[in-house]
Swiss-Prot record:
Pathway: Carbohydrate degradation; glycolysis; pyruvate from D-glyceraldehyde 3-phosphate: step 3/5. It is found in: Cytoplasm. PANTHER family: 2,3-BISPHOSPHOGLYCERATE-INDEPENDENT PHOSPHOGLYCERATE MUTASE (PTHR31637), 2,3-BISPHOSPHOGLYCERATE-INDEPENDENT PHOSPHOGLYCERATE MUTASE 1 (PTHR31637:SF7). This is 2,3-bisphosphoglycerate-independent phosphoglycerate mutase 1. Mn(2+) 1 binds at residues 429, 433, 500. The keyword Plastid does not apply. Monomer. It comes from Arabidopsis thaliana (Mouse-ear cress).
Amino acid sequence: MATSSAWKLDDHPKLPKGKTIAVIVLDGWGESAPDQYNCIHNAPTPAMDSLKHGAPDTWTLIKAHGTAVGLPSEDDMGNSEVGHNALGAGRIFAQGAKLCDQALASGKIFEGEGFKYVSESFETNTLHLVGLLSDGGVHSRLDQLQLLIKGSAERGAKRIRVHILTDGRDVLDGSSVGFVETLEADLVALRENGVDAQIASGGGRMYVTLDRYENDWEVVKRGWDAQVLGEAPHKFKNAVEAVKTLRKEPGANDQYLPPFVIVDESGKAVGPIVDGDAVVTFNFRADRMVMHAKALEYEDFDKFDRVRYPKIRYAGMLQYDGELKLPSRYLVSPPEIDRTSGEYLTHNGVSTFACSETVKFGHVTFFWNGNRSGYFNEKLEEYVEIPSDSGISFNVQPKMKALEIGEKARDAILSGKFDQVRVNIPNGDMVGHTGDIEATVVACEAADLAVKMIFDAIEQVKGIYVVTADHGNAEDMVKRDKSGKPALDKEGKLQILTSHTLKPVPIAIGGPGLAQGVRFRKDLETPGLANVAATVMNLHGFVAPSDYEPTLIEVVE
C-alpha cells in the first residue's frame, strides 16, 4: 500500500517490526480493593492474576475516567464509547460539557440534524427544555441553557417551556432561587419580544426526574407527572414563588424540593408536554438522564404508568447511552476524531483483525476508529461480529460469547495473516450492569479463560500481548458511603451498584516477542487510556506521531 509522507511513521530505534500483537480490552474491568463485592477478585482469573503478580515492570494502572478520557471532571465515570475513542485515537478529545460549549460557541449545535429535527415543531407547537438548573458544571450549566433558549427563539421557537430541577448538591443549597430569578429574567425579555416563554414545572434533583441506575423509578414518575401530565401536589403562579415557598417545607431543600407546576389564572398548568411538541433534555452528563430518556423515547415501557405517551420530537443534548443508542437523536454529535492509530497503522502496512460480540463490536471498530464506520483498507483489515444472546438478561448466560471471541482471536493469530488482533471481551461490563454478583463472578472467570486462549496463541507465534480495560464495573458491585463502607437503603438492604466506577484499570504487556528491557515508565504523572495507542505503535516497531499522548513504555539497555 502506498504511504504518503503525511502518514509515514518513523521506525522505532530499539523495537523491531513484524511481531504479532494481541490487543485485549476487558470491558468493565477495574482495579479495586479485594472484598466480597469485587467480582474480579472473587473469580478464578489465573491468566490476569499472573500478569499482576508476575512482572511488576510490565503491569500498571491507568486512568479511564474524567479528564483522562475528555470528560469535564474527575467525578465523571468513563464509559465504553469515550474509552475506546481514547484507546484508538491516542489523544484526548473533548467529550461531554466541553463538546457542548464548542458546539454552542460556534453555532454548530443549531446546524445539526438533532436541532433541525426538534425545530420542526417550532411553528405550531411548544419547545420544552428539561434539566438541572445550576451552574455547577457537573450535569449541566445555566449558561448553556441560556444559549439554547436564545438560539431556539432566534430560529423560530414561538412557545418555550422550561422544566427546572433544582440542584443544591453541586452548588450551595439555597442557590436555586438565584438561578430561577436569572432564568425568569431571560424569559421575561423573550416575552417582551413576542415569544411565549415560561417556566412550566420544577422539583428537586434527588426527588424529581433525575434518578440513576434504576434506583427509584418513582423519582422519574414525579417528573413525568409534572412535565407531561401537568400534575403535581403543589401549584404556583410563578417559579420564584414556588421555590421560595417550598424551601420552607419541613425537610425540604434544593435537592429534595417537592414537585410543582406553574398554573395560569384559571388554575390550568401552563406547559404540559403534548402531541407534536419538541423536548430537549439539556443535561450533558448522562447518568441522571438515561431513565428519563427511556420514559420519553420507549413506546414499550413498563416502569410506571405514564397515563399517556405523547408523540413528541425528542433529542438529548448528547446521546446518553451509546450501547442503547439512547436517545436516538441528540443536539451535539460525538467529537470529530482524526488520524487514529488504526488509520496510521494501515497506512504503514499493518494488517488488523478486530472482533467482539454484538454489544461491543462497535466499540472495538467504530469507536476505536474515531467514530468512523467501515474499513480504512479492506485488503488489510477484517472485522468479525459474533451475535450476542438476545431476549435474555446477560446474567442468565454470564459467559456470553467470551470463549467464541477467544477462539476467533486465537485462529486469527495462528493464521499468520494479521499483525494486530484486537478484541473486546464484554462480560465484566454487561453482566456487571445487571447487579447480579454471582453471575458477574462467572462472567469474569469466562473473560479470563478467553484471555488465556489468546495468550496461548501468542506464545505459539512468539508474539506480544497488550491487555487493558475501557473502564471499571465488575470490581465493585456495591454502593458505598463516604467512609467507603457498603451503603444500606432505608430498609437495611445492601445497595447494589450497577454502574461503571471511577477506578483505574490495569494494563499489562508481555509475550515471548516482547523485546528485552521493555518496561512501563515511571515518569508519567497521570497516564490514561489515551497513552495506549502510542504504546501499541511502539510494539509494532514505530514511533507514534508527536502529538499523541506519550507511550507508556521505555526500553532499558
